[in-house]
């Protein structure tokens, strides 16, 4: 696991080699965008202390979606007083986590990736970090496409289904920063291919829907994209989407 890295003014990246989550500081308070894997709880207090904060300074955890590598430290932050927010279409899987459906259902996904050694490396890392035992999170507040959330930084929600039914990206307009979750990644963790691209097909509920959701990302105005997997990408959503489409 890595400690917090300031990516831009008041925006911090945390997590591990393969999984990112973020903190956005605004007016002395924090919004967490996603929440990594359960094992990240072990360093949570130290990570926050490193940027001059404590768990009680996190007002909200805004989740791009309900996958287990994005919800891990939610219980610890909620216990410290944070609200939890997610798109209404992912609330059910947040409350009752289990195997994904569609293309990502194990029976469909495994035959497509089981021969890749990187797949087993990634799955091993995530399992050791608690990804196979995600927390059950009840009572989250739900949002919808177009909502501007009343949390530090006031992100605007753009619904981008495909990776999950409720997947959403979050635009912090005053920071010109787009948190893309798993609508885009900047590295394919099964092949190592770098650059903006869709998540690997076997991880998506519907890759065709994820492809269609690129149209919602393309016109957004930002100069920094922060993914759930891979390095920050400096450039416009339009340029990132063009690169992703070129790989389809």
Predicted regions and their residues:
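Conserved beta-strand hairpin/beta-sheet module of binuclear metal-dependent hydrolase folds
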Residues: 2-51, 170-186
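Short, structured coil segments at secondary-structure junctions
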Residues: 7, 79-80, 221
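Short alpha-helical
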Residues: 19, 39, 68-69, 92, ...
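Residue-level marker for buried hydrophobic side chains located in beta-strands
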Residues: 31-33, 62, 84, 177-179, ...
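Metallo-beta-lactamase
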Residues: 37-39, 129-138, 148-150, 154-161, ...
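Active-site HxH/HxHxD metal-binding segment of metal-dependent hydrolases
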Residues: 49-139
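Binuclear metal-ion centers of metallo-dependent hydrolases, dominated by the metallo-beta-lactamase
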Residues: 232-248
């Amino acid at each position: 696991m890595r400690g917090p890295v300031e990516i831009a003014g008041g925006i911090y990246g945390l997590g591990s080699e393969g999984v990112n989550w973020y903190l956005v500081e605004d007016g002395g308070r924090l919004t967490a965008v996603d929440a990594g894997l359960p094992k990240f709880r072990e360093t949570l207090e130290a990570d926050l202390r490193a940027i001059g904060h404590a768990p009680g300074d996190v007002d909200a955890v805004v989740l791009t979606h309900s996958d287990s590598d994005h919800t891990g430290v939610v219980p610890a932050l909620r216990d410290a007083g944070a609200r939890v927010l997610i798109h209404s279409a992912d609330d059910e899987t947040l409350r009752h986590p289990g195997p994904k459906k569609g293309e990502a259902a194990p029976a469909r996904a495994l035959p497509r990736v089981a021969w890749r050694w990187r797949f087993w490396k990634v799955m091993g890392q995530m399992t050791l970090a608690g990804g196979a035992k995600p927390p059950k999170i009840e009572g989250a507040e739900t949002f919808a496409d177009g909502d501007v959330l009343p949390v530090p930084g006031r992100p605007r929600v753009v619904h981008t289904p495909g990776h999950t039914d409720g997947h959403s990206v979050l635009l912090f307009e005053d920071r010109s920063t787009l948190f893309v979750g798993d609508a885009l990644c900047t590295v394919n963790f099964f092949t190592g291919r770098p650059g903006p691209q869709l998540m690997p097909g076997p991880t998506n509920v519907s890759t065709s829907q994820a492809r269609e959701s690129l149209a919602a990302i393309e016109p957004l105005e930002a100069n920094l994209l922060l993914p759930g997997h891979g390095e920050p990408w400096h450039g416009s959503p339009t340029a990132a989407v063009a690169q992703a489409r070129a790989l389809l």
